[in-house]
Regions:
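Helix N-cap / loop-to-helix initiation motif
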Residues: 94-98
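Active-site catalytic-loop/activation-segment of kinase and kinase-like phosphoryl-transfer enzymes
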Residues: 1-19
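Active-site acidic catalytic loop and adjacent metal/ATP-binding pocket
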Residues: 15-63
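Active-site activation/catalytic loop segments of kinase-like enzymes and analogous catalytic loops
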Residues: 62-93, 107-126
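Hydrophobic packing residues in well-ordered alpha-helices of helical domains and bundles
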Residues: 1-7, 81, 132-135
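ATP/Mg2+ or Mg2+-diphosphate-binding catalytic cores
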Residues: 113-157
Length: 157
């Protein structure tokens, strides 16, 4: 599988470059960590409850921002990510380190996860395979563009 081969090459490349993020420099916030619209229960147009089976914990806010942005937009655009992040910054602090390391953190998290592929092999669900492939495409984009994304986030802050 080309995706698996590419992921192994990307992991080696990132590891050799020492690009994995020191999370001690990042702002931590209490959060669930993987909100999804699939977890929202509605009564008409009003959210009535959030269904979840995982406890909240402290996660890097950079992770929450880039993950939620990428699931919403599906195509990666540094200027739109910066606008999304700047809107959040109107309500809560996001440090320059959070912005600088955001794409590297996301790349490291995505590279270390087989989510989508493993579930596809267990269930045969094509949507899970598509999700795994989408995440690998995101890794390909970030391995080539993380530096530019990082610089754009800091520049537009």
């Amino acid at each position: 599988c080309r995706d698996l081969q590419d992921r192994l090459v990307m992991i080696a490349r990132v590891s050799d470059a020492g690009a994995f993020v020191n999370t001690n420099a990042l702002t931590l916030k209490r959060s669930h960590g993987d909100y999804s619209v699939m977890q929202l229960l509605y009564d008409g147009s009003e959210i009535k409850a959030v269904l979840d089976f995982v406890n909240a914990g402290e996660v890097p806010i950079a992770w929450e921002l880039i993950r939620s942005y990428s699931y919403m937009d599906c195509t990666f655009n540094a200027a739109r990510l910066a606008a999304y992040t700047n809107e959040y910054r109107r309500y809560a602090e996001v440090s320059m380190d959070d912005l600088r390391y955001m794409p590297y953190l996301y790349l490291g998290q995505l590279l270390s996860s087989t989510y989508g592929y493993k579930q596809y092999l267990q269930t045969g669900d094509e949507e899970l395979l598509a999700f795994g492939r989408w995440r690998t495409e995101m890794c390909r984009y970030l391995i080539a563009n993380a530096g530019e994304v990082s610089a754009e986030l800091v520049r537009l802050a």
